[in-house]
Amino acid sequence: MKRSELDIVLKELTEQIYNLLGDKLEKVVLYGSYARGDNTEESDVDVLVLTNMEPEENRKILWTLNKIFSRVGLEHDILLSMFLLDKKAFHARKPILPFYQNIEKDGVVVYAA
């Protein structure tokens, strides 16, 4: 997928996430191979959805967010992978987990409150 096509997908995805969460949406971050620019035809699109909600609230919206990701992915014939997390947990784990550090280092912010 070309970057211009990916930008369209990410814009549509972010709009739908924002419509669901409103001001509870903190950030949408593209990470992984598409963010680094080393994606292949088989690569999925990794997206972090960072909220300012409690973990219990995140669990309640997980199913709806999965539906949004699936629908947008099917419409554009691309596999979208979602990682949903609250910002407190992300910042608490970032100093000790390389995965979180890589998102911080390589991630491309698509939306920030």
Pin down the residues of each PLM region.
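Catalytic core of pol beta-like nucleotidyltransferases
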Residues: M1-E26, R36-E41, N52-A113
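Recognition helix of helix-turn-helix/homeodomain-like DNA-binding domains
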Residues: S33
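Short beta-strand->loop micro-motif that forms the acidic, two-metal-ion catalytic signature
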Residues: V45-L50
